[in-house]
């Protein structure tokens, strides 16, 4: 309710407003009034009913009447009613025509404040003394690469843990003092990088990633930061500059969830939690103009949803619903139009005045009206606080210091300009006397009376607020808000299980918003069950099925385990949002973990039923109800155990790359030691313990016992047999282990005991052990989610490459300060004048007519642009303005040919009267609202990349480099030209990123025009002014520019020549000149009935008020109709007609390359893009080292698990499974690679493809090529770590081909890793979400493994599936690896593998077996024995190879076919990417033409 009060200062005359519910924050519209009225009705109705019930109850139990009246007087009081339940004041009656929403909210707060015994209202202020924040320079001193990462961290370890040196540090915030009392609204001013964000985070007690000096003191009343973080986290919150929400959720669902999590226990009596939260969220949505987006997805930069401004308001509304007492807002007006930004500040002011909250707001572009609302101001200058105190006195303080405030400059702009040496103006007579450096400003402030008074005030506050009683009051107020069954010390409002319930509901809504992943899993797994079970279809109840029956059980367990690995992806998708909500004290991360398990259970259960039902009966496992349900129970339990194990790994790590390697190693270990790949008796002693810790091993033993116990299997093959050998009697034996001479069947129990050392008595014991694993890892997962803090944030630190850092240190530049002092050079100098000629000048006129665009939302066609017309001429800057959601960005996308959805139903776009040609997109520059750049590149590299590929090939490399240098200087980026782009907090800040975005488009020398989408968003006023001056300079050099702008001051707007003004629905309300001092614009609106523009008003804000788009305003007419009927509209059409006729007469450019879609040839594109992708991998050592570590550890683990396997029958099978398990890491390698591909594809598709920087063919080719070197390294590492420990090289000693076969094996392994990356590229090429690509890769990988001939040979496959044997690439790879590794070596059976039987009377073993051995092979251990023959069924490894279809003589053919499969992957990647992702724009063009 706190911020629902915010509109109390808004206009109260707008309840009849006719246009409510649009995208701007509307203040108290009739929609807000209706939402508040409904909330009031519910609360008042509940209160009246509660009153009646209590009175009825008191009559029935008169002996308790006094107690009840006392309770009633204490707890009732939401709406004043008399003893009959009638309203005392009809303005508070929701059913009365006199109801007043603003008055109701104010009165509700008064009543809450008066009933302190029940509601226990408190206020919290903030005081800080000697506040200093610092970071460790070693955390981010230079960019890590593949080569320097290890030395870097070894050096750090040696310095900190061996030498015990603390290492260099840098100050982020210098010592400062301040006091903010409850009800005071404070603005934090400073240029980007001055330390404003760090200051707000520190006040909000969110200092993870940097340090606070031990001598610093921060107090919240009498509470310490430690107490705030531990017990009252939700009372002090920080709203980050960036938006971070679940994109699949709707706005309504997002905000209702936040409201539920902070719904107090001491709410008005009779009002349920859900009703309270639902209606409070509705009120806040209405207040912030979000009601119309209730059912719209929030979205993000890559998923379509609400507009950027609306998404910012969602973040604001979420904090509002948090109802925190201390609110730290970090540039929260970014992306809002000026009128909405002003109303947001008014809302915070009302909250501070009425509810006595303590808001702190960092704001970069602050109008005078907004500044006048603030009580106090904090001015930051490179980490120094150079002023703190009254906002009204700040201006005079600096004037008295000796600085001059120019006319028309707002106070906030004046204060911020003081931190820029090039902007501040010294008053006459004060030259040389005023402070110049940050340190001098700081010292002046410390010595000033104002500074000394602040120190005294802080000391007094700390003394006054140190009592235990005050702490106890805050504790009681917090406890009153908490739900039942919650510890008073908990920072949360609702209990743990209520949190789980609400989060589970939210997760269901997320699944509903994007069901593709779960549907893909369900139908993919069920489909795979049909495929896999058909491989083992209808196994006979005979000994010939022993291997396949156990293999089928193993594969069932293995497949379920593989699918669980993907859950790590979804865990990391939600982690940043969960961490944010933890900081808001909405819920425990453990509650989210619990709820995620609960909401995944239905999907898991459906998959378990679907997969196992099909699989069990198609394979023909034991068909009795008890056995089936036990099989289902064990498989489902094993799935849950593996799910919790992998979730535990995800929760224990901080990045996805960190998680994938241990997860893959663990999966490999659990798979190898399940008991099938290496039977329990054959495991080496040193690794036998792994089997004991393997939940799959216990599940597998139970499944084997379930299938084999007390079951006889008919013998399929006898030794000896055929010819004249007897068909019965003791002189023959069945071939499987566990057979008895003379018996025609094998006892299943004996078979499993002798082969696997399994016991049926362990069946239910093992189930209990699996349950134990489930419970244990469930607890570890929950615990780790709660205590793992995630990746550490950094202070705002510029990051340089190591070589650049050395150069800077030689130049004595202090890069460790974390900030670079930005000196703005003067442009009117000789250098600039000489370089002006370098700016590309236009000459072509671009115009459009009746442009209409609509999208389908559900079943409704919504018009986004409605017959918009206009033009952009060389030398002119046209401003595109309108409220948030008016269609400004959509118009830019439509004009620049960047729409990817929807239909352009009408309209034309012409250049010089001619239709757009194929070179249009590369002939324009488009500075997008999102600053998307490759995070591993430096600023200079990003600019050079754009220049090389977008400037004509006729321009030399030297000229391109010179132009890049010029743009760097033009945009004042010299100080960080060699800095790494990085990520937020460790790299460029917001301002620097925006400058880079503009620079990337300028270095392309767009010859036609430049589009800029909110280029000043997120910048301080001085930087915004310099950007506008730059835009003006470009236009003066002949460039045509169309620029959207959200929060222009009058000074900024004056730099523009023309204005295209849109209202919601994409309707034009004005297109024309601005005129000197905006006279043309103002006269137009006043001529057609608009109220007079006050002389001191900002025309931008006045226009929004005129058309009814400003909060609390109402249009007196439909200005779209006014425009259509105006003479200006007719003049515009006449001008368009004239341009259509005259401009087409201009001669065409005779450049032969003019119509080419790309400036650079394909080969040059390929070289540059491949180099960039390779460099990105090189500079992302976490990816490469994770990849290498996975290969090395898995290969070593595999190699030593099968260490020097012998050539017994089981040994040969072990070596075969060692090859099989070597391939298992494929899907983990794919999952490691997918995020890197997606991040590069997002950058390409959002920015580089629309600008025609390079072709999609180049993009795919570069991705394929850049991975090959790393795959060769992986293959080499895998070869040495696996081939020699397994001992395959020993098999080649018998033929003296150790080196030849070793080299061939290396080549095959390298090809395997190349195949892995190409398969990953094939899977992700046409899919949007990497989770789905990972699922698809698992399915393809499973099929490749299943049909490669290891589990089931070609001869044993059902006839239908033989084609899959030939289509599986692993068929040929396994054939090569096994034949090269095993061919031409002798076989020696283990003791238990010999078949023992007696020869007939009078025969030696050799005499009896010789005819059989000539046909079937094998050898006798005791040829001359007449009592017992010991027969081994195999003599040389070639027999084993023939059984599995591997032929050494065909190794060349097989390796060639495998290479062909790699080629198929690559070709398929090109085709699928073109089919699924390239045609989007093409489809729109076709529909537009039709």
From Swiss-Prot:
Biased composition (Basic and acidic residues): 58-67
PROSITE patterns: ABC_TRANSPORTER_1, ABC_TRANSPORTER_2
Sequence positions that bind ATP: 882-889
Intracellular or extracellular location(s): Membrane
Keywords annotated in UniProt: ATP-binding, Glycoprotein, Membrane, Nucleotide-binding, Repeat, Transmembrane, Transmembrane helix, Transport
Listed transmembrane segments: 517-537, 551-571, 601-621, 626-646, 659-679, 767-787, 1183-1203, 1217-1237, 1268-1288, 1304-1324, 1333-1353, 1370-1390, 1455-1475
GO BP field: xenobiotic detoxification by transmembrane export across the plasma membrane
Gene Ontology CC terms, in alphabetical order: membrane
Compositionally biased intervals (Polar residues): 1-12
Topological region Cytoplasmic: 1-516, 788-1182
Annotated region described as Disordered, given as residue ranges: 1-26, 53-75
Positions of glycan attachment: 1291, 1424
A molecular-function term among this protein's GO annotations: ATP binding
Membrane topology: Multi-pass membrane protein
Domain ABC transporter span(s) in chain numbering: 151-407, 846-1090
Cross-referenced SUPFAM superfamilies: P-loop containing nucleoside triphosphate hydrolases
Family: Belongs to the ABC transporter superfamily. ABCG family. PDR (TC 3.A.1.205) subfamily.
UniProt-recorded name of the protein: ABC transporter CDR4
Organism (species): Candida albicans (Yeast)
